[in-house]
Amino acid sequence: YPSVAPLGDGGFVVIWRDDYGSQHGGSGWDIFGQRYDSSGKVSGDEFRVNTETSGNQSEPAVAVLSGGGFVVTWRDDHGTQHGGNGYDVRGQRYDASGVAAGAEFLVSQVQKSGNQYEPSVASLKAGGFVVAWRDDSGGSHDSGSGYDVWARVFNADGTQAVAEFRVNKDQKSGNQYQPTVASLSNGGFVVAWRNDQGSHNDGTGAGSGYDVWGRVFNADGTQAVAEFRVNQVHFSGSQYEPSVSGLKNGGFVVAWRDDQGSSHNDGSGNGSSYDVWGRMYGANGAAAGDEFRANTYISTYQYGPSVGSLDDGGFVISWHGYGQGDSSSIYAQRYDVQGNKAMVQLVGTGLADEVT
């Protein structure tokens, strides 16, 4: 999937995977980007992010930095040729004008056995950034799981601020993956991930087949809130594909896919085969209300959620779904600062839609 982030000048940058890189002077697959101004017009030329052009580059993620620049991370499938593993996570910083700042760098620098991928990146209040990723050789790395989630914190200049560390401290059996990271207004960050060993108990009972877990960190990488299960009510079926975003009030919101929606009722009736659910948290990491279903249409499949915070303190959740009278569309639901639905769902089409 492509990744998009807003820029400080009101524009935005889009990053994507190009499967035809060999025709563009690059790899089999490359990572490309394009900046746009505040009116949506192209700003500058399309550019290739990856310097290393052997093998395939995929799974891009982008975050805007406080100085006006941005950082891109991605999966490199030819890591053994680039100083790393079979698969590695690499990164590249850019300044506010879109010019590469320094050389491409290896994010997963210590964990070099097995594969490292599924990167997620977020900018931090102090000017640096944090990257989280999936490590497929967790059993060899700090006595972790089959798969683990790791993270590393960088300063604004790309130097290391906090050495890479395992995010899932307690949940070490089974596999932990699909990480998503977001910055918090106090300078810290939160990581959420998929745990496929739902028998893990957080003190309120065992979970699902797959569960969504989270953990909150201070800016220096120390623990602020111990890991916790996000889906506290829905234990049957599987909960995964998490997305997290920090909120203006210092808290955060997590959205995820629920594969047992037909058995999960939010008071308005049972849901779809797959549903999108969410839950808000306060700055102290405590849940701010119950988990809620984002999709109003409760037939067929709703999945692939993405959540983003808004300047008014609210947030918006978007997802891929099958609605009433259409085959496949992108839906969105906006929420106010209290978590109440603030407007009707938006349905995108294959045309040049505009919202006014």
Regions found by a protein language model. Give the residues of each.
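Extracellular, repeat-based ectodomains that mediate carbohydrate processing or recognition
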Residues: 1-343
